[in-house]
Design a protein with these regions (language model features):
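Low-complexity, rRNA-contacting terminal tracts
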Residues: 1-59, 81-196
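An N-terminal amphipathic alpha-helical segment
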Residues: 58-75
């Protein structure tokens, strides 16, 4: 049975450590660290993932690579007196995922664009790298597109800040349904945050 190019790319990215040569991966990470934190790119690194999430090679669709620090929340030190163990600085887990933080930072940098979706492309000891698909709702080619035209409506403005992307829905627990998900809908707040 003949397999498509997308299938081959997807198989490669299932185990990137085994599939991508180590020297090439090290050079790529070094280059990405030198790039700006939010860096516009010509085409996606993972074509299969980008296409699966709605990417099209057309005007009005913008690709951005960004990096976010790995690990738990970084909190500034408190000058008021207290036991070091009670400062609440270490081992604090964010309520948002790192992927969601990346999407929001990119959206703040591009206020005229809407975040469609994002996917992981790599990580090193300090950073995680994501590629984010942005859409220009005012572009005629997007307004006339059958698959992407929905994003031009006013009700989708600022969708990333309201947890409407895939990463946002996962953080709100909306990827779960059935038994155990009773306190997630209509929202966590409506259930007094007893759902997470």
């Amino acid at each position: 049975m003949a397999r498509s190019l997308h299938h081959a790319v997807r198989e490669t990215w299932k185990r990137p450590k085994d599939s991508i040569p180590r020297d090439y991966h090290r050079e790529r990470m070094a280059q990405w660290r030198r790039d700006p934190v939010i860096n516009r790119i010509e085409r996606p690194t993972r074509l299969d993932a980008a296409r699966r999430m709605g990417y099209k090679a057309k005007q009005g669709v913008v690709m951005v690579r960004t990096r976010v620090r790995r690990g738990g929340l970084r909190k500034s030190k408190i000058n008021m007196k207290r036991k070091p163990s009670k400062m609440g600085m270490l081992k604090i887990t964010m309520a948002k995922s790192i992927k969601r933080i990346a999407e929001e930072r990119v959206a703040r940098k591009s206020p005229n664009l809407e975040v469609l979706n994002s996917y992981w492309v790599g990580e090193d000891g300090k950073n995680k790298f994501f590629e984010i698909i942005l859409i220009d709702p005012s572009h005629p080619s997007i307004q006339n597109d059958k698959q992407l035209g929905w994003i031009t409506k006013n009700r989708h403005t600022g969708r990333v800040y309201r947890g409407k992307t895939s990463a946002g829905k996962r953080g709100r627990g909306l990827h779960n349904k059935g038994k155990g998900a009773e306190k997630l809908r209509p929202s966590l707040k409506a259930n007094l945050n007893r759902g997470k």
